Amino acid sequence: MSAQESCLSLIKYFLFVFNLFFFVLGGLIFCFGTWILIDKTSFVSFVGLSFVPLQTWSKVLSVSGVLTMALALLGCVGALKELRCLLGLYFGMLLLLFATQITLGILISTQRVRLERRVQELVLRTIQSYRTNPDETAAEESWDYAQFQLRCCGWQSPRDWNKAQMLKANGSEELFVPCSCYNSTATNDSSGFDKLFLSQLSRLGPRAKLRQTADICALPAKAHIYREGCARSLQKWLHNNIISIVGICLGVGLLELGFMTLSIFLCRNLDHVYDRLARYR
């Protein structure tokens, strides 16, 4: 076996192994995009409610994952069977996917400020209309979950809940906040929380009934609640995840660029090897 044949054989199996890896990676990308679309319990869904293009990007991410899996399968078969038509198709579609992912990464990075502004607008609107419409609770439950996970209360501070008319105690000027603001680690006393929870619900009136999730209730502002707003934590979360998404897009793009180079090299040199083998027969 000549050096060129050994090199082509090495490239062939290299493409096969790494396309197998990218098949698994494409499955993970698809699952991540699908999770953003269907998950209604995390603050990722709250971000999606605030910025419609995020839902579009999630769908693009899911489709991108499916395309990555299909291309990886195409590359595996084309490299292993040494089929020029499949390798050429693999190169062309990989080039298209490369351009799409780079464009997606640039769009996400340039829309960060707009996304943060839209999130802030939705948060303040959700706080102001808290519990006013029992039929529309998706944003409220998502924000309760965000406060619980980020260990914060309100947007800038718990005083933001002054704007929520339904959480003001009847006949009292005392401020009430959702129980997602309650800092249970400050007291380590769940029994005190239960007593507080039951007594305050009765003061909020008939519309303050407990929903299906246990995260919805009310607490007086003097209780042990988180004193920091969620603005900084949520903006930091958005910033870190946007950087991660852009980094993944660029990293995968560079790998795809390398695979395109190897596939076109293998595709162009297969005929030369076969012609030489035919002369030796």
From Swiss-Prot:
Keywords: Cell membrane, Glycoprotein, Membrane, Transmembrane, Transmembrane helix. GO terms for biological process: defense response to protozoan; negative regulation of myeloid dendritic cell activation; negative regulation of T cell proliferation; positive regulation of immunoglobulin production; regulation of defense response to virus; regulation of humoral immune response; T cell proliferation. Residues 1-17, 75-85, 267-281 are cytoplasmic. It is a multi-pass membrane protein. It comes from the Eukaryota. Its main location: membrane. It comes from Rattus norvegicus. SUPFAM superfamilies: Tetraspanin (SSF48652). Pfam families: Tetraspanin. Glycans are attached at N170, N183, N188. The keyword 4Fe-4S does not apply. Residues 39-59, 112-241 are extracellular. InterPro entries: Tetraspanin/Peripherin (IPR018499), Tetraspanin_animals (IPR000301), Tetraspanin_CS (IPR018503), Tetraspanin_EC2_sf (IPR008952). It is found in: Cell membrane. The chain crosses the membrane at residues 18-38, 60-74, 86-111, 242-266. PROSITE patterns: TM4_1. Interacts with SCIMP. Interacts with SOCS3. Interacts with DECTIN1/CLEC7A. Belongs to the tetraspanin (TM4SF) family. B-lymphocytes. Tyrosine phosphorylated; leading to activation of downstream signaling pathways. One of its GO terms (cellular component) is immunological synapse. CDD domains: CD37_CD82_like_LEL. Gene3D superfamilies: Tetraspanin. This is Leukocyte antigen CD37. Structural component of specialized membrane microdomains known as tetraspanin-enriched microdomains (TERMs), which act as platforms for receptor clustering and signaling. Participates thereby in diverse biological functions such as cell signal transduction, adhesion, migration and protein trafficking. Upon ligand binding, two signaling pathways are activated, one acting through phosphorylation by LYN leading to cell death or a survival pathway with activation of GSK3B.
